[in-house]
Amino acid sequence: GNVNTQNVTAKTEVDIDAANNITASGNLTSTNANVDLKAKGGSITTNGTVNAHNNVIANANGNINTNGDVTATNGNAVLNSSAGSVTTKKVTAGQAVDIDAQQDITANGNLTSNNGEITLDARSGSITTQGTVNALNNVIANANGDINTIGDVTAANGKAKLNSSTGNVNTGNVTANNDVDIDAANNITASGNLTSTNANVDLKANGGSITTNGTVTAHDDVIANANGDINTNDDVTSTNANVDLNAGGSVTTQNVTADQAVDIDAAQDITANGNLTSTNANVDLDAGGSITTSGEVKAQQNVEYNAKGSITTKGIINSTAGNIHLQTDAAQGDITFGGDVTAEHGNINIDVLQNGNVTDNDNKFTALGDKGAINSGNFKLQIKGAGDVDLHEIYATNNALIDVANGNLTLAKIDGNLVALQLKTEGMQLKVGELIAGTKIIAQGSDIDLNKIQQRLDADGLLTIVPDGAQPDKPIDNLKIGEIITNKGVRFEHLWLNNGSIKVSEGMFHIDKLVVNNVAHFSNKHMKTAVWGAPPQRDGSDSAYWNNIAVNNPAQNLDEWQQEGTNPNKWMYLHFTAQPNIQHSNGALLDLRNYDYVYDQRFTAVDHMLQQLNENKAEEYDINHAPVVAQYFRYDLYDLDEEDSKSEPAKITVEA
C-alpha cells in the first residue's frame, strides 16, 4: 500500500518503505542518522523539509517530488527514480548530491555539495536547474534530452561536465577549477561566462551550433567544435595555451586571445569583430568561404589567412618574429586591407590563386629582417589569374616582388633592396609613384609608368634595371621613368621598347642593349638624346640616333638578349658617362649638338648630308651648322700657329 505522514522525527533512522506511494505532508528529520525513503512501486512526495545528520536516500519506481528543502548535513543526498522524473527544491549535502531519473530532472532550488560532487543523470529525459549548482568537487550532468542550467554552475575543485546525448545544452555561468566540458547532440548556448581556472574549456556541438554570450576563459585550452556555426559574442581567452574554434558552418568572434596559438577553421565564413592575439605563437584562419577581421590581428610567430572566398581586414596585422601569409583560392577572391601589415622579423606573402583584386586604404606593408636573408625582410604578392593590385606603400628590407598574370598594378610607393614588378598580359598598366631600390629593379609590362626611382642611400655600386615586355618575346609598348636618382649611376641590362622616355637626375646612365621600334628619349642633367626606329625627325634633342630594327630582333635571340653585358655586334648601346656632355654609343649617329661628344668620335648623318650638298666642304660647316665654331675644332682638332708651321723640323741627335 501507501504511506502518508505528517512530521516524523527520530534521533537515529527515519526509514519509510511502501509498496506504492510515500507522501510526507510534514517534515522528516533524523538528528543523528539517515532518512531513507523507498517506494517500490510508486512515487515519493515530500511537502516539508527532509533533514538528516547523515544521508538522505530516496528510491522510487515512479516520480520523486521534494517540495521542501532536502539536507544531508554530513552525508549524501541521493534521489533515484527508476522509471519517472525527479523534481526538487533546494538540495544540500555535506558530501555528494546524486540525482538519477529515468525521465526528467528539475531542480527549482539550489543544489549544493559542500565536500563532494553533484551528479545529475536523466537517462531518457532532460535536466533543468533553476538555481545554482555548487560542488566542492565535480559537477556532472548527463541527459538524453536537453540540459538547461539557468543558475550558476560551480565545481570549486573539480570539473563541470554537461552532456546531452540527443538534445541541446543551455547554460548560465559555468565555473570549474578543472575542465569545463560541454557536449551536445545539437546546440550549445552559454548565456553566461564559461571559466576553467586551471584547465580547459571544451565545447562540442556534434549536430548543431555553439553560441557563447559571455566570456570564455581557460587556464589552458579553449576548444570549440561544432557541426554548425560558432558565435562567440564576448571575449575568448586561453591564459597559457591555445584557442581552437572549428565549425562546419561559419565562425563569428569578438576578441580572441591565447598565450599560444589561435586557430579558427570554418567550412564557411570567418568573421572576427574583435582582436585576434597570440602572445607566443601563431594566428591561423582557414575558411571555406570569406574571412573578415575587423580588429587587430597580432602574433608572436606566424599569421595565416586562407580563404576560399575573399579576405577583408579592417585593422592592423602584426607578426613579431614570424611570417604573414594571406591567400585566396576562389573564382573571385579579393583581398582588401584596411590597416597596416607588419612583419617585424619575417616575410609578407599575399597569394591570389585564381582571380581577385588586392587593394588597401592608404596603408603600409612592412617586412623587416636581416639583410640578405630569405626567411625575413621579404614581401611577395602574386595573382595567378585576373585581378588588379592597388596598394599605397610597401617596404621590405630585402626583396619586394609583385607578379600579376592578368591585371594592372598601381603603387604610391615601394621600397626594397631588389624590387620586381611583373605584369604578364599585354595592355595592362604598371604605375608607381615612387620606387626605391638598393641594387636591382625588374619591371615587366607593356605599359610602364615609374614617376620616380631612387637608390637606397646605403647602397653600393650601380643600380641595375631590367625592363621587359609583358611577354619576353614582345617589346614594352610604352615606358616612362620621370626621374632616376642614384648614388653612382644606373645600368639597364637591356631595353626593348616601342616608345619611352627616361630621365636620370643623378649618376651615370648606361643602357647595355637597346632596341627602339618607334622613338624614345633619354636624358641626364647635361644631354637629351633621341633614339629612333621609325623615320627620324628633329625634336630638339642634343643627340639623335637611329637603330635598324629590321635586323637582330631580340625575339629571335632571347638567350643572347637576356645575357648581361653589351653585344655591340648585334645591338646598340648607349652610355652617359660621369663627364658632362659625353656619351659612348655604337648607334647610327644622326645629329649632335655643338660641344657635345659621342665616342667613338665620328661625323653625324646630318654632317654627311650637308657636306654632300656643298662642294666647298671646308666652308659647309660654318655656313650651315655653327658659323662661329670651326669644323675641325669641334672634332678635337687644334690650330697650329702659322710661324710654328713654317719652322724647321726639330733635330734628333743619337749618341752612341
Locate the predicted segments by residue:
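Long, low-complexity, polar and repeat-rich extracellular regions
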Residues: 1-656
